[in-house]
């Protein structure tokens, strides 16, 4: 045989991971319904609401962008910009207060988004929308080769990275507040699957798990009392069997 260094490896693939599919799907679905179909608010209003974290204040990235913009304008106008000036501008932006009517509007936008159907409730229109959204990552990846000339095989599981990644991510159009965890693997966003575990499993099973050859991960949490006794065990087994009968991958 050959060593790995001599080209003896049997498998030659790289498996990059994607996650937050539910956030992406719920965000785009909310935009389609509220901005383009019902015209409840504009994209510009939504961008402002996100920058202000739905009324909870500017997020860190927005503070940096606004501060940089102000300093750039000052420099272009010929004003002297030193470290003290930059610090003063940064402090001013961080202390900026939102007008009460703006804060109320951003909260109203958040409330409207909360009422939009979400992935994880066995609603075909939403679930197949999520399936198409996942394809925007999985299909293009097939067109590239890794540095060794092998395949890229898409994966959709976070290994808990959804928590630190969410901590670095601003507010999203699905109603998620800045710096909170994004969705875990292919699971629905936390608290958004309100029709029970069977409905959530049916939604996740509608994703194309075959194309995600590096694996998907569907996580669910149960209170022990929900699975207690013989009846609880039988229900748990039925849920798992149903998920795999629908071509789910990893639960």
Question: Positions of the model-derived regions?
Answer:
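Acidic, glycine-enriched catalytic cores built around paired aspartates
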Residues: 1-251
């Amino acid at each position: 045989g050959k060593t790995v260094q001599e080209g003896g490896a049997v498998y030659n693939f790289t498996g990059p991971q994607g996650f937050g599919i539910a956030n992406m799907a719920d965000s785009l679905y909310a935009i389609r319904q509220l901005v383009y179909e019902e015209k409840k608010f504009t994209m510009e209003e939504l961008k402002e609401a996100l920058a202000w974290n739905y009324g909870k204040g500017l997020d860190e990235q927005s503070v940096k962008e606004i501060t940089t913009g102000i300093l750039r304008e000052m420099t272009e106008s010929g004003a002297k910009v030193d470290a003290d000036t930059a610090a003063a501008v940064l402090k001013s932006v961080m202390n900026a207060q939102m007008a009460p009517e703006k804060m109320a509007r951003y909260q109203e936008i958040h409330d409207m988004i909360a009422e939009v159907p979400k992935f994880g409730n066995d609603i075909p229109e939403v679930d197949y929308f999520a399936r198409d959204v996942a394809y925007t990552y999985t299909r293009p990846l097939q067109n590239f080769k890794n540095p060794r000339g092998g395949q890229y095989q898409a994966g959709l599981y976070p290994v808990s990275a959804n928590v630190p990644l969410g901590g670095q991510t601003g507010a999203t159009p699905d109603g998620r507040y800045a710096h909170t965890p994004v969705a875990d693997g292919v699971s629905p966003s936390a608290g958004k699957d309100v029709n029970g575990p069977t409905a959530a499993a049916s939604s996740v099973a509608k994703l194309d798990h075959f194309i995600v050859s590096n694996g998907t991960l569907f996580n669910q949490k149960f209170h022990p009392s929900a699975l207690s006794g013989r009846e609880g065990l039988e229900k748990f087994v039925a849920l798992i069997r149903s998920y795999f009968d629908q071509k789910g991958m990893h639960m």
